Amino acid sequence: EAAIKYVAKLYLDGGIDGIISYGGSMGAAISSAVMQSLPLGVPKLLLTTMASGDVRPYIGTKDMCLMYPIAEAGLNSLTKQILTNAAYCITGMANAPKVSTKDDRPLIGCMMFGVTTPCVLRGSAFLEDKGYDVIINHAIGTGGISMEEMIEDGYVKGILDITTHEIADELYGGVLSAGPNRLTAASKKGIPQVVAPGGLDLLNFGTLESVPEHYIEDVRNNVRKLYKHNTSVTCVSVTPEEAYEIAKDMAGKLNGAKGPSVLCIPMKGWGACDIRTPDKALGWAGPAEGPSWISDPEKPEWSLRSCRYVQGIKEKIDLNKDEMEVLIADYHMNEPEFSDLMSGILYDMLQGTWKKGKKIRNKSIFPVKEERLYAIHKAGGA
């Protein structure tokens, strides 16, 4: 704590242009905490023998460079060259020219995962064409945490929160959790937010062997499905009942919003793996339905998971708020029309022209309160 305060004062007084440290686990633990306390953009270089392994505790969500120094201490013909390289690295960064910010455009946040890429790329391109810069964070846990921090620190002026799957990992034990505060900063800050359940059809784990046994047992009993993305990433599907609980969690967070907030729910799937019919343009080439897809018995083109999610949202969301809206969309997450819906709403919010109900223009988009959605679902059904 003393080091954090001391270095902060040095930085504020203009006494340092960068920071470098060298050590083992204890040295890395102390120095990385100091580095994490400094603003983004300040050069940070951490040399540690702990660099070969899980480095999340050291990096956190800051822009730190990590270098494996081979040895923990001592000077010899090898370490002299390594430390010289490190010294030139940090001095090079410290002497880098300051980037001009006079022509900077307002920054918009966006969350992406592989399964939501088409939606995100189209939406971000639209906003960039409208004069905004877009920062796209990878929704792998640290990405969500850093997005929340950037919003809290005032960098982000609005968020296109397409990919919220980190919430499922937090609630049900996946490895890509962003913690319990995901989806809270925009509400507290009062910035415009347009949200979707992108990627919430999957829980994420490492190798197949790392998937908890109770989930493997569910797969054997056809309670959920398993998708082996690659040798390092294995996913299991979120059940409709879990989606119902996730919806209530998200609704509770959105209820605290101090600014304009819209939740858009695509009923035909939440990502590339959640699709009824193969479509390369939407991210799934087949040959069969996506590995997390579950058809609603009464409306097979809709996802049962989406229907249960909507029920959870309707039970918990506060639609009496003038700046809160929930829209049901008869689209898949990665269809161009759905991306245009979300980015268009956010643009209207940023321009100050958004009004509740403005985007409800055709039979494919309607507010969650419309009872026709529930005519085929008994209370607590599905």
Could you say what each language-model-derived stretch is?
Residues I145-S146, A196, L200-T231, C273-P278:
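Redox- and metal-dependent alpha/beta enzyme cores, enriched for Fe-S-associated oxidoreductases
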Residues E1-P97, T101-K188, Q193, F205, ...:
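Metallocofactor- and cofactor-centric catalytic cores in central/energy metabolism, strongly enriched
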